[in-house]
Regions:
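Short beta-strand edge/turn micro-motifs at domain boundaries
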Residues: 1-17, 128-153
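Short, structured motif recognition centered on aromatic/hydrophobic residues
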Residues: 1, 39-40, 95-96, 109-113, ...
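Short, conserved clusters of charged catalytic residues that mark active-site
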Residues: 34-35, 95-96, 130
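Short glycine/acidic-enriched loop and turn motifs that connect beta-strands
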Residues: 117-120
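A solvent-exposed, acidic/Ser-Thr-rich amphipathic alpha-helical stretch
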Residues: 49-102, 106, 113, 123-126
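Short, low-complexity N-terminal intrinsically disordered segments enriched in polar/charged residues
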Residues: 2-54
Length: 153
């Protein structure tokens, strides 16, 4: 049995902006989608590890097939980068297809989901995965990834 522990969530809450702050109240679903697409481009430019270091919270969590959650910016980005490097094994860029997004009523949290795949040209084979990202709006006025879940198909 797993018992909830509020102390585990305190670091995440400390990184998140106050829902009543002006920057948060101006958030839209489109700003969340824009952050998701920017992150996808960053994976191509920086690689998965550096992209997650840039866009993840200090207490981010990454869930990948066959392993427990990687918790914390360093561990999560390292595991995420290694996973993408192993799956891709090429220099082909990843294309991201955002399927949807939801913004909480308080506008400081939301999630995006969709698919990502390697652009393999004529080849039909290659990396394909669905993703879900839980985003938190941080105190610096930026959307940051709190949770990343990848599921290859």
């Amino acid at each position: 049995d797993v018992e909830p522990n509020f102390a585990d969530t305190l670091p995440l809450i400390e990184e998140t902006a106050n829902p009543r702050s002006v920057g948060v109240m101006e958030n839209t679903v489109q700003s969340l989608i824009d952050a998701d697409e920017l992150y996808g481009r960053s994976i191509n430019f920086r690689g998965g590890q550096r992209a997650l270091l840039r866009y993840g919270l200090e207490n981010t969590r990454v869930y990948l097939p066959g392993m427990g959650p990687a918790v914390g910016a360093e561990a999560a980005s390292s595991v995420y980068g290694a996973f993408l490097d192993t799956q891709l094994a090429t220099t082909n860029p990843i294309s991201l297809n955002n399927v949807g997004a939801y913004l909480s009523q308080s506008k400081e949290m939301g999630y995006t989901y969709g698919t990502m795949q390697a652009d393999n040209g004529e080849s039909a084979e290659g990396f394909e995965a669905s993703y879900m990202r839980l985003w938190r709006f941080n105190r610096s006025g930026e959307w940051r990834i709190a949770v990343e879940v990848l599921s290859p198909f």
